[in-house]
Amino acid sequence: MNGPSPRSSHLSQPVVKSVLVYRNGDPFFAGRRVVIHEKKVSSFDIFLKEVTGGVQAPFGAVRNIYTPRTGHRIRKLDQIESGGNYVAGGQEAFKKLNYLDIGEIKKRPMEAVNTEVKPVIHSKINVSARFRKALHEPCTIFLIANGDLISPASRLLIPRKALNQWDHVLQMVTEKITLRSGAVHRLYTLEGKLVESGAELENGQFYVAVGRDKFKRLPYSELLFDKSAMRRPYGQKASSLPPMVGSRKSKGSGNYRQSKSTIGSSDNSSPQPLKRKGKKDSNSEKPTKVKQSVKSKNSHQAIPDNDEGIFKAGAERSETRGAAEVQEDEDTQVEVPVDQRPAEIVDEEEDGEKTSKDANQKDDFSAMNGEAEDRAGSKVADAPEEEEGIPDQGEKKASPSRVNGGTDEENGEELDQVTEELQPTVDEKGKAEGDNSAQDEAGLDAQRPPRPEVTVTSPQENEGNESNKASSAVA
C-alpha cells in the first residue's frame, strides 16, 4: 500500500532538466541554454559532449563543469539542478568573473522629477547690450618715411594683441616701409612727438617712421592732406585715406560757381541762376542770393565810370611805377591779320609763262619748216624720173608735185615768211654750237623716224585736187 504501484510507475514522465552554461573566462558570452533529457543524456560524459557542441568554446572540448560563484567542480549528472547556472571549462583552472551579470541590461534608476514650478525672478542687474560692446578690430595706421614727401603713405593693420609688444610692432613697420638707414627704431607723430608704446597709437592716424637718424621736421600734414581731415573718431573703421575737402560733388557747388561767373556783370545782362523744383533747392538758393548781392555791391564799386571795362586794374601796381610807356613810330612793325592785308597782284609768273610758250612755239615751227623743206626737195628730185618712166601719168600728178614743191604763190609766200622769221635764230644757234654740233644734229635727223607731212593749201587748190581725183577715178 505504501510503495508505488506498477501502473503509476509506468505512467510517470521522463525527467528533463534545463541549465544555462557560460564559458570559462569569457566576460562577453551571455550563456547558452542546454536541455538534459533523461533518455538521451544518460551519463555525465554525454552531458559534456552536449555542452561542447552548444557552447563552442575556443579552448576545445569541455572537460569540467563549475558553479558560477564559488567555482565548485561538478562530477556527477545527479548534482546538476534544473534551471541552474554553470560554467563550462577545459583543462584550465576556474576563472572568477561575475558570470551571472553578463548579458543583463542594467536599468538606470528614474530620477525624481520636481513637479513644483518656481516663479520667474526679475533681475535688476544692469548689463550692457551686445551692440554696445566695442569690437576688437585691428588698429589701422598710416606710415610715412622720414623726410619723404613724395611717396604716398602706407596703410598698416596691427592686431590688438600685438600692440602690447612694441618690438613686434616696429618689426611690422620695418616690413611695410623700407628706409635707407635700415630698420625702423622709432615712430613719431606729424608734430614730432615720440611714440613709446602701442597704447599711444590711435586708429586712423599718420606716423613718421624713423631709423637711426634724427627726426626731420617737415610739413608732412600740409603737403599730404588738410589738417581738418586728420582726426577721426575712435573705433571708426579706417579703410582708406581721409576724404578730400572741397570736392566738386559737394552741395551747392553749382550755384556757387554760377554766382562767381556773374561777378562784375550788369544787372540787365547778368544770367539768372537756373530754377529747380523741390523744397531743398529753394532753401539752397537763399545763401547764393546773399552772396550775389554782396559781391555785386563790391563789383559796382570797382568798375570805373569811363566805361573801360572790368579788366582794367583799379589801382596802379607797384611793379609799373616809374616805367615809361614806349610810343609807336614809323619803324614799329605791326602784324596785321591776313584778311586785313591789301591784295597784291603778281605779274612775274604770267610773263615768264608767256616767254616760255613763245620760245616753244618757235622751236616747233623751225623743226617743222626744216622737215618740210627737206621732203619737198626730195619729191622735186623724184618727179622728173617718174615723168620719164610714165609719160601718160605725168600730167595727172603735176598738181600734187606743184603743191609739195612750192610752185603755188600762196603756199610759197607763207613758207617764205616763216623761214624769214626763224632764219636769224637758226643762224645764231648754228654759229654758237660749231661744226661738231652740226654734224651731231645731221646724224640724229637721219636716225629719227619720219614725221607726218604738213602742207598748207588754199580752198581753190583743194577744189582742183578733188576734181583731179575724180577724173583719175573715172579713167
From Swiss-Prot:
Positions bearing Phosphoserine: S270
Region of interest (Disordered), residue spans: 234-475
GO BP: cilium assembly; dendrite morphogenesis; intracellular signal transduction; neuron migration; neuronal action potential; positive regulation of smoothened signaling pathway; regulation of cilium assembly; regulation of Wnt signaling pathway
GO cellular component: a single term: cytoplasm
Keyword terms: Cell projection, Cilium biogenesis/degradation, Cytoplasm, Cytoskeleton, Neurogenesis, Phosphoprotein, Repeat
One Pfam entry name: DCX
GO MF terms, alphabetically ordered: kinesin binding
Superkingdom of origin organism: Eukaryota
Tissue: Expressed in hair cells of the inner ear.
Gene3D superfamilies: Doublecortin domain
Biased composition (Acidic residues): 407-419
Start-end of Basic and acidic residues biased regions: 353-365
Subcellular location: Cell projection, Cilium; Cytoplasm, Cytoskeleton, Cilium axoneme; Cell projection, Kinocilium; Cytoplasm, Cytoskeleton
Biased composition (Polar residues): 252-272, 455-475
Principal cellular location given in the protein's record: other
Domain spans labelled Doublecortin: 17-100, 139-221
Subunit annotation: Interacts with DVL1, DVL2 and DVL3.
Function: Protein that plays a role in the inhibition of canonical Wnt signaling pathway. May be involved in neuronal migration during development of the cerebral neocortex. Involved in the control of ciliogenesis and ciliary length.
Protein name (database record): Doublecortin domain-containing protein 2
Organism: Rattus norvegicus (Rat)
